[in-house]
Amino acid sequence: MEKLSGLSHLLMTVFLYNFSTFMVIPAITDVTMSALCPGQNECSLAIYLTGIQQAIMGMGTLVMMPLIGNLSDTYGRKAMLTLPMILTIIPLAILAYSRTKNYYYAYYVLKTLTAMVCEGSVHCLALAYVADNVPESRRVSVFGILTGIGSSAFVCGNLSTRFLSPASTFQVSASVAVIATVYMRIFLPESINVVVENGVSTEANVRLLDEDKGSKKNVRIFKTMPSFDDTVCLLRSSLTFSQAAIVAFFTNLGDVGLHAALLYYLKASFHFNKNQFADLMVITGIAGTISQMLLMPMLATAVGEEKLLSIGLFFNCAHMILYSIAWSAWVPYAAAMFALLSVFSTPCLRSIASKQVGLSEQGKAQGCISGLGSFANVVSPLVFSPLTALFLSASPPFHFPGFSIACAGFALMIAFAQSIMIRAAPPIISSFKVGNGICVEP
């Protein structure tokens, strides 16, 4: 618990940041519909704009996640956390001021641009921060606790939305985002010094993506920019890492497809509003928090993270299928309870990936996994947004409003099948180095 207490400022930062971002999720659908299609329960324009936004964000994060991870290995986790946390404030402040059509479009553009840097980067850097300070034997448990803190912020954010007006929701969200940034800058210690000063063995700290030691300081940033060949080399360095990357892609593909369609599907099928959305998310968040904070640390030791990953993906797939065939308004609430087990997948996947690289490569590894997951953010809207709009329209090919969600569940089924093939392997110290984009034996 001593090392975990040393991470308390990180956990508080993650809680505040996630609280500010999650609390607007139930309200944003109503705000979007009111701005674009006032008085309607179905809006194809809103669905397509959401899909375009996700695709652009995915293309941006596909490039930015590996870059941010690489730079954090050199310049520190705290320094790189500052940028996305500041950028998050800007679009929230716009809707805090006004939610009319013109302001919504301003929010839409700025949210799309800033999310290229912000989306997933705080979580990615937080995982690398944990890996800097926690030994491998306890890493999956602490990853679970970190994700559980995010889930508790999810619950608190959605509960607060339940009792706030849309205007107050965005005002509180923007204020908490500012507090999170200030708190992080004042209290969070830098972790990269821990890796350097603890005197870890040279062998355990060998970099998979080697940088030119003779580079001048003023061009060092360009040496840390990842190329496509660097990513390929990192994937080739470990079969387990490449399998984890495949699982990450299909998991993100399904999750993005679900989140893009679910709220519009529930609004069209059962006339849900922000209060029902908040209730549903609170159930999901409470189940996830209990599971990650209490069940996961015990099960990770008893079962192993590879099996726990498969269990999480199986129940994630099952709850998507149940959403897609919901025949009554109570069914989505029952499906939300599957989060009790489906939340295992993300921390287990990240822990498996983190054990395949040395301490000085944690930013690169987490950035690579996040970047490949972001590629799914590009593909998913191209597939699921047209399907969602088509099957929620007045003239679908056949009556199956949740068809796009069922297809998202199929993507999770592929991830589940791949996860079964992952076997526990000893951590990889170094298999390859990269020099000028070429993989060579050390």
Descriptions of predicted regions:
Residues 27-47, 260-277:
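Short amphipathic helix-loop junctions that connect adjacent transmembrane helices
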Residues 61, 138-162, 177, 372-383:
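Glycine-rich segments within core transmembrane alpha-helices of 12-TM secondary carriers
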Residues 82, 86-102, 314-327:
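C-terminal ends and interior cores of transmembrane alpha-helices
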Residues 1-7, 190-247, 252, 268-269, ...:
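Juxtamembrane intracellular "pre-TM" segments in multi-pass secondary transporters
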Residues 108-150:
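Cytoplasmic helix-loop-helix junction between adjacent transmembrane helices
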Residues 177-189, 323, 406-442:
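Multi-pass alpha-helical transporter architecture, strongest
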Residues 162-177, 386-412:
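A membrane-interface helix-boundary motif in multi-pass transporters
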Residues 15, 91, 102-121, 330-346:
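Hydrophobic core of transmembrane alpha-helices in multi-pass small-molecule transporters
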